[in-house]
Amino acid sequence: KVKTIIDKAPVITEKMLRSEATSNMYDKKGNVIWSQTDIRRNYIKYDKLPDLYVKLLLNTEDDTFFQDRGVSIKGLANAILSRGRRGGSSIEQQLIKNVAFSSDVKDRTIDRKVKEFWLALQLDTNWNKKQILEWYVNKITMGEGSFGANTVAITYYGTSLDKMSERTPENI
């Protein structure tokens, strides 16, 4: 059964992971099935992310990010016990969720969690951690049509993330 589920998982490409002015949702063959362009996004490279921001983000979202292989076993167990309705996903799983799956609660199933798990392993195998984290911070939505950490910093604080003081990132 697991192989059948994995076989139905979408193929993740670098194009899907890279942030663009448009957010797209893709089918398993890599075809765009949904697109949204009325968003704000200002891309920031990994080497421009303040160290404090990275530490705070990982402490909050995935404290084993640089040690794990793309998945959180604890998070997966948590999701299975809650029938796929609870979080605990790794950074890789969250990134996969943002680029490949619907955010609709009714779509959160054990099958989808298995696909996320598999795709997160593939992500971790095919790309390095810094690249994955760069894509992640540029894909996340923080409200008000703002996508990515840099856009959030500009929207809420009036300055880009790499120009913020060390006191400010903890408020993001």
Regions found by a protein language model. Name each.
Residues 1-172:
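Juxtamembrane regions of bacterial inner-membrane/periplasmic proteins
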